């Protein structure tokens, strides 16, 4: 089926908008590239769109994108632990307007989520030029993943030299540096948090050597490492690479905070991209993303009997588009292709909640593969000084072992 939309936008000619509360929530000036797929003044964009600069996000007191955006209207941020831990996935999540699984997260216009899970808590604000948020359905240009909206993080082409060291209680440590080297720039960071002790009420019992013991959940030591490298060859070509690593522990404790069962999470992500953009309206990106997770756990009374799980999720693809402009109209047409693969290996305890349980046989799932091919376009026509009409359409072909599907 063909997804399309027609928008008739009327723009008010006054150039200033005032609000009594939280003026930074109504930043309407500036150039937006996310809402329509090409550069357009925010005031002339017929969408619920807001742009935050990296400096505005720093004013929240946060050090990363996720924790800065959670203070902004219409952005929902979920996590479980004090260091943005989340049970099982190890990731914090952002959604717009409360639509679960319907927020598409982009970094420099390239998808940066794995099954609607992202690591924006790893992205240091020192690297961010601006964040563009489009609330509401962005599915016409971006597909069904953008039902709730789109978050596009634009990183800096060049960084200033900077160094940050901070420390606090509970084992909190923060180290970050950015280095500008002409055409190249580098950002490094590590963030640490100590153990918390019990953070929940009694949740049930675990059978430890045959005895039922009440248990509580607490978080152990955690670390986040981040590396980003950019190289701008010239005004048209740019290469960027980003590495995130999150390593933390979660514990089932007894009432005295002695560890009964110990869970470890090692989550690593790689993002690589080559981007091309020229003055003739051509824009193309080739990208590769990978996420690997390992999460073993064991009972302290039987540490050699280890339950484990490993997963590997990869994405690679290209997106290219061409924009034509005239005095009266702007047209865009683009194509994209993406391939995703996923596999999971694990070996679980045969009996849940029992330290004496034996392990099941190892299980293997995948490699599963999915191919997504898209054609999209839009036409923006000025009808008068205050009115434009915009027609947009997108066709998706999704191919997998489970069958093909058109959207």
Protein language model features and the residues they cover:
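Transmembrane beta-strand segments of Gram-negative outer membrane beta-barrel proteins
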Residues: 29-30, 155-168, 183-188, 281-282, ...
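N-terminal periplasmic "start-of-domain" segments of outer-membrane beta-barrel proteins
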Residues: 29-60, 93
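Extracytoplasmic beta-strand/coil segments of soluble accessory domains associated
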Residues: 66-110
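N-terminal periplasmic accessory domains that precede
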Residues: 65-68, 92-95, 106, 118, ...
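Short acidic/polar hinge/loop motifs at secondary-structure boundaries
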Residues: 93-94, 110-135
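Periplasmic-side early beta-strands and strand-to-turn transitions of outer-membrane beta-barrels
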Residues: 160, 178-265
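Face-selective signature of the C-terminal outer-membrane beta-barrel domain
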Residues: 186, 232-246, 266-407
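Cleavable N-terminal targeting peptides that direct proteins into the secretory/outer-membrane pathway or into
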Residues: 1-23
């Amino acid at each position: 089926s063909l997804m399309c939309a027609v928008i008739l936008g009327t723009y008010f000619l006054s150039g200033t908008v005032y609000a009594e509360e939280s003026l930074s929530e109504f930043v309407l000036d500036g150039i937006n590239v996310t809402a329509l797929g090409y550069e357009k003044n925010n005031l002339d964009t017929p969408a619920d769109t807001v742009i935050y600069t990296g400096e505005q996000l720093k004013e929240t007191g946060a050090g990363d994108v996720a924790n800065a955006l959670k203070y902004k209207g219409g952005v929902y941020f979920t996590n479980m632990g004090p260091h943005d831990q989340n049970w099982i996935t190890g990731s914090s999540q952002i959604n717009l307007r409360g639509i679960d699984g319907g927020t598409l997260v982009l970094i420099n216009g390239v998808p940066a989520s794995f099954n609607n899970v992202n690591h924006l808590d790893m992205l240091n604000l020192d690297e961010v030029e601006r964040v563009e948020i489009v609330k509401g359905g962005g599915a016409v240009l971006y597909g069904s993943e953008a039902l709730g909206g789109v978050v596009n993080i634009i990183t800096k082409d060049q960084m200033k030299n900077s160094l940050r060291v901070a420390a606090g209680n509970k084992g909190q440590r923060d180290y970050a540096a950015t280095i500008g080297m002409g055409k190249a720039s580098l950002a490094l960071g590590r963030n640490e948090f100590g153990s918390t002790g019990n953070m929940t009420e009694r949740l049930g019992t675990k059978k430890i050597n045959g005895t039922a013991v009440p248990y509580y959940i607490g978080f152990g030591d955690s670390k986040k490492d981040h590396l980003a490298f950019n190289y701008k060859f010239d005004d048209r070509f740019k290469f960027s690479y980003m590495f995130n690593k999150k390593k933390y522990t979660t514990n089932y404790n007894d009432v005295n905070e002695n560890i009964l069962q110990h869970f470890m999470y090692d989550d690593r992500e790689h993002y690589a991209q080559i981007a091309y953009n020229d003055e003739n309206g051509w824009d193309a990106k080739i990208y590769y993303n990978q996420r690997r997770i390992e999460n073993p756990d064991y009972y302290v009374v039987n540490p050699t009997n280890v339950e484990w799980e490993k997963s590997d999720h990869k994405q690679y693809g290209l997106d290219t588009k061409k924009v034509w402009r005239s005095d009266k109209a702007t047209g865009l047409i683009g194509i994209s292709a993406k391939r995703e693969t996923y596999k999971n290996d694990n070996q679980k305890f045969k009996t849940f909640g029992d330290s004496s349980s034996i392990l099941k046989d190892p299980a293997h799932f995948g490699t599963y593969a999915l191919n997504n091919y898209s054609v999209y376009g839009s036409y923006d026509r000025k009808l008068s000084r205050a009115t434009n009409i915009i027609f947009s359409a997108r066709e998706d072909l999704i191919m997998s072992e489970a069958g093909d599907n058109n959207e």
